[in-house]
Amino acid sequence: MILKNAEIFDENFDLVKADVAVGNGKIERVGQNLEGADMHDFSGCVITPGFVDIHIHGCVGADTCDGTREAVSKMAGHLITEGVTSFCPTTMTVPIAKIKKVLSVIKDCMENPPEGAAVCGANMEGPYISAQRCGAQKADNIRKPDWHEFKDLYEGCGGIIKLVDIAPECDENHEFSEHASRFCKVSIAHTMADYGQAVEAFRHGVTHVTHLFNAMSGLQHRSPGVVGAVFDDSSVSAEVICDGFHINPAVLRIAFHQLGEDRTVIISDSMRAAGMPDGESELGGQKVFVKNSQARLADGTIAGSTANIHQEIKNLISYGVPLRQVIKSATINPAREIGEANKIGSIKVGKQADLVVMDKEWNIVSVFKNGKLNKN
C-alpha cells in the first residue's frame, strides 16, 4: 500500500512532501514518487505518526480500574478513532489487591490485543503519593512508598509497568526511586515537595513528572517548586495536560518553550466521562460532576480530564506552540518515555505503520494501525 501526495513528518520531524509505502504492518519505504499496488491519494493532507497516550484512566464510560478486559477493549476501540494508536491504561490510588487485578487485565490485553489502539503497558498513578496533595485520588488508599511491595507487583504482572508515581518527600532515603528506576520510569506526582526535594529525587532515579503544574508546587520567584526543578534539569521529561482548563494557554506556551521539543509529553489524563455528554460520572471510587466538559469532585477539585490527544494537538497549534514540538510531544516523546521508541512514534523505515492522516485544519481523515485502515 502506498500513501501518496501528502506532507509527512519524516523521521527527523521535518515536514516534507513524501510518499509512504506500507507492507506487513511496517513502514517499508519513504520517498518521492513511490509506485505500487493499492495507492491512496492524500493530496492536501498531513501524515503524522500515530499518537501515544501514556496517561489515560478511561473514556466512553470505561475505566482502567473497572478491572475488566471489556473496559480496556472499549477504550482501545474508541482511542483509535481519535488517532491514538498506542496507550498505557493508568491506575488510580485504589487498594493493592485491585491494582494487582487491573495489572493482570492489562497484561492479558497486551498478550491478546483487542481491536483498536495497542496496549503498551501500565501506568501506576498511586498509591505512593501525598495525602495532602491527592487531588481526585482517594486519600484512604494512599500508601507509603514501599520498594518491596512494588517489586512484588512488578514481577507479579510480568514487568508490564512502564511508569510509577511517587511523592518524593515520602520516599525515605530515596530507597523506592533508586530501586524502582532500574525497572521503569519513576515520576513525581501529587506531591508537597519543594524545589530542593525535587532536585534530590532527580539525583536518585526520578526522570519524569506527572501532569506538570497540577498537584505540585508551582514556580515562584523565591520558591521555584517542583515546576522550577523540572525547568532546571534537562534530563527530566514532563507530562502536560493541554485542554486549556488544567493549565492556562499562556502558561502552556511558556512551559513548552522552556522545556524544549524533546522533554514535553502530551497526555489526556482522561477519565470515563471523556467522549460522553456532561453529567455525573465516577473516578477512583468518587463521584465526579462534568459540566461544560470540565470534570470536578463535589468539593470543586479538578478530577481528571475529558480531553483527548487529538483535541490537545489542535489546542496547542491554536495557542502558537511550534508545530514540530506539538507533534513530537504526542508521538516520539511519549514513546521514548515508555521504552517503545524503537517500534513506534516516528515515520521511519522498519517501524510499525501507525499513522494519522489529517487535513490542513488538523481534522482526522484516516488512521492506520499496523498498516491497516481503521474502519471507524
Language-model-detected regions and their locations in the chain:
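Histidine-rich, glycine-flanked metal-binding segment
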Residues: M1-T48
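C-terminal cap of metal-dependent C-N hydrolases
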Residues: A6, R336, S346-N376
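Divalent metal-coordination and catalytic microenvironments
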Residues: A6, V20, G25, G44, ...
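Alpha-helical scaffold segments that flank or form the walls of functional sites
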Residues: C45-V46, I54, T64-A117, N141-G156, ...
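Divalent metal-dependent hydrolysis catalytic cores, especially in the metallo-beta-lactamase
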Residues: H57, S73-V102, A117-S130, C157-D171, ...
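Active-site gating loops and adjacent loop-to-helix segments of metal-dependent hydrolytic enzymes
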Residues: G77-C88, S130-G158, F202-L212, S223-S237, ...
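Active-site core of metal-dependent hydrolases
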Residues: K151, E155-M276
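His/Asp/Glu-enriched, well-ordered alpha-helical/loop segment
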Residues: G225-A238, G244, F256-S268, A274-M358
